[in-house]
Amino acid sequence: MKRTGKVLAILLALAMLLSVTAFAAWDVYGSNANHNSVVDSAPTTATTTALNSYIDLSNGGRGWDGVDNVPVMETVNGTTYAYVLYDGYSSYGGQLAKINCSAATPYVVWRKQVSAAAGFQLSTPYLDTTNRAIYIGASNASVYNNVAISSPVALTAGTAGTVTIGGLSLLTAANRVSVPVYVGHTSVADRGTLTTEGTATIQLGGGTPVNLTLSTTQSSSGTTYKIYEQATYDADGNVNGYDYYYYINHSVTASSTENATLSISVTLNGTGTIESVSMFANKGAVTKVSGIDSTDASGVTLTSVVSSVNGQINTPITRYGKYIYFGTWSGNTAMQYYQVDVSRTSFRTKTMTGTAGFYWAGAVQLGDYIYFGGDSGYLYYRDSNNFDADTEVTLITSDVSGAGNVRSTIMTDGTYLYFTSQGGYLLCYKPNATTGKPEYQWSAALNATSTSTPTKVGDRIYVGVYSGFNKGGVKCISASTHAVKDVIAVTDKNNFPVQCSIVVKGDGTGTDYLFFNTNSGSSTTENANYGCGYCYSYDGTTATQQWASRSDTYALGGMACDNGIIVFGNDYDHLYVVK
């Protein structure tokens, strides 16, 4: 967006905030409070263009991690948006991007740095459509609430623009400072002609100043940052120009952690603007992202909810009433599950310590109780009004030998609890009507590993499975007879590990449509079938492929669907929008 329109855009965003109408949303893992990924509308056919094109969020980076969780989505005033948490690799840290999915060519509305450094982002966010915010859990993401600027800082040629923030109490001596510097806009015809360069200096807590070079030609490396180009779009998704930024994301070390001062100085050979300032400690954290209706990242703000979290936040963030829930993981160590009251600005926190850690194991509420699985084969339950009280836990291996880790989110149909285990089982429990304790009902052997949260339509329960790094498929289990059928047999397909949940369009009585992606390999060779997104029809007997996206790379997290639009990403930070 051109700078002359920035003030108008901010005022427009504020006006929109007061009039936003969200008609639909996939706002949490599994799309709803039950985590049952059933949708009324989804693309059962797709164009070749949609299946072979993607939004590249990587900014040129590459790694073993990218989009490794499920996006959240909403439709506002007729336009469908996706919010994607992903790894921006070493240059950009963890990022949150807002995508306009309804445009003829989907595009990035804004992107915001949300963590200090590169790393897997496995926690699916929670979208608060009422209060217009997103809660994210990430590694190296303890944001300092008091490191911010109230308005952008204008830069003139040859004169240093400065930001000074004092009185800081630092969580760690080493921290990472994020400073996006806007340097101009060009038309499509003048693309790449901007010559604005400069220098920057960052100092924290009396430590050694870090001197940086901002260059239009040199590659980003060490203390050098190359200019970044971001296309701008018209209402139909057509490119109508380019914005240019220097995205400073640099580690600085303080010599004193108390009453520390952060000093930033930027000098350009042209005009520009310091858009915002953020600083992150190298600790896990949950952050509230506000200003999501802004038309660019300058209006997006970060507020620390829980800082200095030990271990990785690898579970989805779920919400019931005024509480959000998430778990942590660190190898075989006993770790914590959190309940956080987000109705208060103080974000009151309660925790319980599990026998082991929590990985992909999102929580569900049924009645007054919260249920979630864990490693070493445990099923936990807690009274939502007394979350940190000692409560008996259920060891599922006492009911099913060899059940293994529970690395799926719990799904409920309102009566029963369903989940899978890495030992290769679909399990069903029912809460005791008096005590809330989950009581074993039945299980079904899948004959393959599963981390897939079950999806239930009618009598059919669908789960994804995998065997090793190459084989996998989809199973259909009868809720009444517990019989297991192959939708896609593990022995039938190569490059087909399905670790995600299955999105289903249908009612389980006729033909259902199943949507999922595969976590396998890397290849752009046509028909190589690495890391694809798929749609299959299944009538209870026969499965037929309806479409498949291009061969790409590992796609772990799974799909989201809203307003008939499917989105999913992969480890190359490629985001597919299928409609």
Feature map (PLM): residue ranges:
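Autoprocessing Asn-cyclization modules and mimics
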Residues: N146-T199, Q203
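Bacterial N-terminal signal peptides that target proteins for export
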Residues: M1-L8
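Bacterial N-terminal signal peptides
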Residues: I10-S19
